[in-house]
Amino acid sequence: MARIAGVNIPVNKRVEIALTYIYGICRDSAKRITKEAGIEPQVRVSDLTDAEVAQLRDIIDNNHTVEGDLRRQIAMNVKRLMDLGCYRGLRHRRGLPCRGQRTHTNARTRKGPRKPIAGKKK
């Protein structure tokens, strides 16, 4: 198995698809990376040489924020919003949607399961 950015890349998949197993790399980014490395996107990971894997690793390490660094950066951005006390920060703090969705009904994913209120009947 090829190991790039601390992630074991599946050997039996095409390079373009296998790179998406890394957090922070989507199909579009994977296409750009393979083009920059000069590797055909249809090639299987098992057919890559060690030099090509090293080249992919270098491109990803130097040009992309991935895995733990990206997760940390996102968490710091959310924490900064919460510390500022802006509307988006308050919504994050309360666990509610922060992009304008309705919350009277729906928003169950963000709010979690319903909490029953004792003594309340229709």
Curated annotation (Swiss-Prot):
Q: What Gene Ontology biological process does one annotation of this record name?
A: translation
Q: What is this protein called?
A: Small ribosomal subunit protein uS13
List the keywords (alphabetical). Ribonucleoprotein, Ribosomal protein, RNA-binding, rRNA-binding, tRNA-binding
- Molecular function (GO) terms listed? rRNA binding; structural constituent of ribosome; tRNA binding
User: Quick check: keyword tRNA-binding in the entry?
Assistant: yes
Per the UniProt entry, the signal peptide is none
Q: Which organism is it from?
A: Magnetococcus marinus (strain ATCC BAA-1437 / JCM 17883 / MC-1)
User: A Gene Ontology CC term for this entry?
Assistant: cytosol
